[in-house]
């Protein structure tokens, strides 16, 4: 019986690991790999790789040894990517992308009404006031959504996991916006320094497209996270539910 009780807890941890990969490792890997491509003319990475292949061919490096070298390189790449995503991109993108853009284009009740497809939010505001003692306003909409998140986790952990995906998608989008912007500016400077270069020109176009696409994704994901929390709260508060049972066998 104890084993069956612990099984859902173990399985519930798997999505969060996947969300960490989405929100932190992928943007960090993009920044790391993009930096290598942007500085390809400066860093002797291409020559080092060619020399490695030559040494491996001359010394008849075994398949097992080559696999170890490649696996270790990928592990180091993943560690550095996670470090960049967790300690560099995540806090900076929260400050420079989410908060600054939130000042320029704040989320409002009118926008939530359109997003949820309802013309009247009075019932939602009433239900929110019943649960938390006050009504959400335009100024407090983002902060108030966290109370909806806590309520959803309490009532339905399954929907709470879905919220985790929303958070991961938003973090990935805003981190990619920052990484794309840094890479675009750095590559543009390198392009002016070296002069016309077909590779850097093509890479600039790709970075520009990535920057625009990631920003559009960020704009949608931030709405989905905040407005989606209120939508889930409305759905749960408008239907009977049972408190999650604890300690049952």
Where are these regions (language model features)?
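Loop-to-transmembrane boundary segments
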Residues: 13-26, 135-188
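Enrichment for repetitive, rod-forming helical segments
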Residues: 31, 172, 181, 229-232
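N-terminal first transmembrane alpha-helix
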Residues: 1-119, 190-205, 216-223
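Hydrophobic core of alpha-helical transmembrane segments in multi-pass integral membrane proteins
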Residues: 34, 181-186, 205-213
């Amino acid at each position: 019986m104890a084993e069956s009780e612990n099984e859902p807890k173990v399985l519930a941890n798997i999505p969060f690991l996947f969300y960490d990969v989405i929100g932190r490792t992928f943007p960090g890997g993009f920044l790391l790999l993009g930096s290598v491509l942007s500085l390809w003319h400066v860093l002797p990475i291409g020559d080092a790789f060619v020399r490695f292949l030559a040494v491996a061919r001359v010394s008849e490096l075994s398949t097992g040894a080559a696999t170890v070298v490649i696996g270790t390189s990928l592990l180091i790449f993943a560690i550095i990517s996670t470090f960049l995503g967790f300690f560099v991109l995540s806090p900076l993108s929260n400050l420079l992308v989410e908060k600054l853009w939130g000042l320029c284009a704040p989320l409002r009740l009118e926008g939530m009404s359109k997003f949820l497809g309802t013309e009247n939010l009075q019932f939602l505001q009433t239900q929110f006031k019943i649960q938390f003692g006050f009504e959400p306003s335009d100024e407090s909409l983002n902060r108030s959504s966290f109370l909806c998140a806590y309520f959803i986790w309490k009532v339905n952990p399954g929907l709470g996991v879905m919220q985790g995906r929303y958070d991961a998608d938003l973090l990935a989008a805003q981190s990619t916006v920052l990484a794309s912007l840094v890479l675009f500016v750095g590559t543009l400077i390198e392009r002016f320094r070296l002069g016309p270069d077909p590779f850097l020109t093509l890479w600039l176009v790709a970075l520009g497209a990535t920057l625009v696409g990631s920003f559009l994704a960020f704009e949608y994901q931030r709405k989905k996270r905040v407005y989606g929390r209120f939508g889930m709260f409305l759905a749960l508060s408008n239907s009977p539910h049972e408190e999650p049972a604890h300690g049952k066998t």
